[in-house]
Amino acid sequence: MARHVLVVVAVLLFATAEASQCSINGLPLVRNISELPQENYGRSGLSHTTIAGSVLHGMKEIEVWLQTFAPGSRTPIHRHSCEEIFVVLKGQGILYLTPSSHSKYPGNPQEFHIFPNSTFHIPVNDVHQVWNTGEHEDLQVLVVISRPPVKVFMYDDWSMPHTAAKLKFPYYWDEECYQTTSWKDEL
């Protein structure tokens, strides 16, 4: 009996190691979003889940996130060299956006109100920020990005020169699992 218990424990430990946060081995094809791990990565007011991604799941063309922002919280002012699509699931907020241009800094952003069932896209390298303006309700969004893993350039404010923006790579949710091995195209 004790021998069987040891075998079962060994199998469970091996399976747990195989299905670690940084491995696609052992992950089921169909998963329940509410059972996926959520983290704030040291950013107060944020809850982030990578539903399907480059670093965690081996995706090459797109990455999908579920993000929840507490009332008053926001993303940093930032840009990245990928396209981004948002679907607002609940809550309300403001999208601040400056189109990429040949100016030396982002400048004054345009404001767009976002609300449940609204969707918007961020073109490549457009500086933007999403802000939860709701007083009592979380802002929850489903986000799809192209060309993962994301390389983010962060700004202190809208007048900071593009050349002074700080690169954050790997991004917070990719830090633990990112490996410096090069990604190879299928060709």
From Swiss-Prot:
**Self-association or partners: how does it assemble?**
Homodimer.
- Covalent S-S links between cysteines: 22-177
Q: Which gene encodes it?
A: T85
Mainly resides where? endoplasmic reticulum
Task: Quote the record's binding site residues for Zn(2+).
Answer: 78, 80, 84, 128
Keyword annotations for this protein? Answer: Auxin signaling pathway, Disulfide bond, Endoplasmic reticulum, Glycoprotein, Metal-binding, Receptor, Signal, Zinc
Q: Which organism is it from?
A: Nicotiana tabacum
The residue range of the signal peptide is: 1-20
Q: Which CDD domains match?
A: cupin_ABP1
Biological process (GO) annotations held by this record are: auxin-activated signaling pathway; cytokinesis by cell plate formation; positive regulation of cell division; positive regulation of cell size; positive regulation of DNA endoreduplication; unidimensional cell growth
Q: Does the keyword Endoplasmic reticulum apply?
A: yes
Q: Where in the cell is it found?
A: Endoplasmic reticulum lumen
What this protein is reported to do is described as: This is probably a receptor for the plant hormone auxin.
Domain of life per record: Eukaryota
The protein's GO terms of the molecular function aspect are:
auxin binding; zinc ion binding
Give the residue interval(s) assigned to the motif Prevents secretion from ER.
Answer: 184-187
Glycosylation-annotated residues:
117
Would you name any one GO CC term? Answer: endoplasmic reticulum lumen
Among InterPro entries, the record links this protein to: Auxin-bd (IPR000526), RmlC-like_jellyroll (IPR014710), RmlC_Cupin_sf (IPR011051)
Any idea what this protein is called?
Auxin-binding protein T85
